[in-house]
Regions:
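Acidic carboxylate-rich catalytic motifs and surrounding loops in phosphoryl-/glycosyl-chemistry enzymes
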Residues: 39-45, 111-116, 161-166
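Catalytic cores of nucleic-acid endonucleases
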Residues: 76-133
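Alpha-helix N-cap and loop-to-helix initiation/capping positions
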Residues: 13, 17, 83-91, 132-139, ...
């Protein structure tokens, strides 16, 4: 995870970054859930019919005898997190319904795994840091854990993996974040 995070501000929309994220998250998930080690795993699996009647792309999918058993939805948010935190929460609630109500599935787990800094930079359009977001505080104000638990019991889990960006207060532009050092990285438990 640390290696991924050090370059996580680079090419934030690239498929290479996404592939790296999925690889490290699968390793984390399997370390915490060794009972899934023998499953067949696929990245970017397209579920043919979701609970809304459309298709649904699953970041990391675990199969037993060809049947989907574990769905992992991954997010790695680095900057301007607080302004998007409510949208992420709403998306999670909707995606949970799309997966759990999909016809013909007997899922063991749906994991929403987000990787986020405890403190995140806020950039303007010129790439200058205009402030720092307290992501822990924002997440506390947008806690959907009780809703997810009430709706799905333990089937759906929201897992937030936090990390610290070292020396963040000394970074002034997005260029300063191209290679970072991190510490206090949470693990999937």
């Amino acid at each position: 995870m640390n290696t991924f995070l050090t370059s996580s501000f680079q090419n934030v929309r690239s498929s290479k970054r996404t592939d790296e994220l999925h690889t490290v998250l699968l390793a984390e998930v399997l370390e915490a859930n060794p009972q899934w080690a023998g499953y067949d795993w696929q990245f970017e699996y397209r579920l043919p019919v979701d609970g809304f009647g459309g298709t649904f792309d699953i970041d990391i999918a675990g199969f037993v005898n060809g049947e989907l058993k574990v769905a992992v939805l991954a997010k790695a948010m680095n900057s301007n997190v607080n302004k998007n935190i409510k949208n992420y929460a709403n998306t999670t609630i909707g995606e949970a319904a799309r997966l759990t109500y999909a016809p013909g599935l007997d899922l063991e787990a749906v994991l929403f795994v987000s990787v986020l800094p405890r403190t995140a930079p806020r950039f303007n359009k010129a790439g200058e840091v205009v402030g720092l977001d307290n992501v822990l505080s924002a997440k506390a104000r947008t806690n959907i854990g009780n809703i997810i638990e009430a709706q799905y019991g333990g089937l759906v889990q929201v897992i937030d993996l936090f990390f610290d960006i070292d020396n963040i207060s000394e970074m002034l532009t997005s260029a300063d974040f191209q290679t970072i050092t991190v510490s206090n990285v949470d693990k999937v438990s």
